[in-house]
Amino acid sequence: EIRLQALEMTSLRILTEADAGSQIGAEPSMLKLKGSELVQAQDELLFRMVDHLALAQDSANTGEAAVNPAWAEYVASGRYHHRGYTIAGGSSEVQHNIIAKQVLGL
């Protein structure tokens, strides 16, 4: 939650600066990196939660599936689909190079 709010506040700050006419440097690349990391961290948490809830002992008590199979499939599918965020818009390595050039003047 804190990381998400920090990303949102940083995005708003950059947009405000851009609207004011400030030149934008490496900030979009930083946002892209942090955003894709955050999505993957969220997916990992959801995946672990589904894994835990899907234990056989949980469903044995109720006689029903511990997790809705459609939801579990959605979480698993999303986890692997969102891995592509590190590639879309330039791989993480490319984004690191852009940041290095902007910040360090390389």
Predicted regions and their residues:
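Alpha-helical interface subdomain recognition
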Residues: 1-106
